[in-house]
Amino acid sequence: MNKWKRLFFILLAINFILAAGFVALVLLPGEQAQVKDASESEYGFQVTSTKESLAAFVNSYLNDKASNKLDYKVEIDDDVHVAGKIKAFSTSIDAFIAFEPTVKKNGDVELNVTKFSLGKLSIPISFVLNYMDSFYELPSFVHVHPGDKSIEVRLSEMPLTNGMYVKADKINLEKDEIEFSYYHPKQ
């Protein structure tokens, strides 16, 4: 597979997952920050966002982290859409992937892939995810499940400093309700 195509899919999956989870919790100014009930060993706070501000932040974050100008954009409406171009055979090919995020009971996020296409060619999702799982080096907290057509982001396994961790509380894109909790152990 073309080097640029491979890099695109790596950046697409990794950057979106990292940006959506980590950045929304830590850097995005939330509309409302509330202290959750703290246990004796930790404290936390909740971050809320809108689809529009989360998409703007994710795109800004991806552009800041990219080594060269990115040729794709994340949009959030009732699904998460990533659209861009892949350079192949001295031409640009349109690429599109759609995710439907769901929050698991343990606070992890599951990104269910609903559509993937290159140009006008619709490619089987399980094939793309199997290829991604086999040939891309993903972070240890990102798990690809080709049979389920999903990507699991284990936020609790995401390495953060000082033992901090993140949990997704609610992602309801239809109602524009996005909430994460950020926890820090007491020291």
UniProtKB/Swiss-Prot annotation:
Q: Which UniProt keywords apply?
A: Membrane, Transmembrane, Transmembrane helix
Q: Name one GO cellular component term.
A: membrane
Cell location: Membrane
Q: Where are the transmembrane segments?
A: 8-28
Indicate how the chain sits in the lipid bilayer. Answer: Single-pass membrane protein
Q: Does the keyword Transmembrane apply?
A: yes
**Full protein name:** Uncharacterized protein YpmS
Give the source species.
Bacillus subtilis (strain 168)
What taxonomic classification does the UniProt entry list for its organism?
A: Bacteria, Bacillati, Bacillota, Bacilli, Bacillales
Q: Which gene encodes it?
A: ypmS
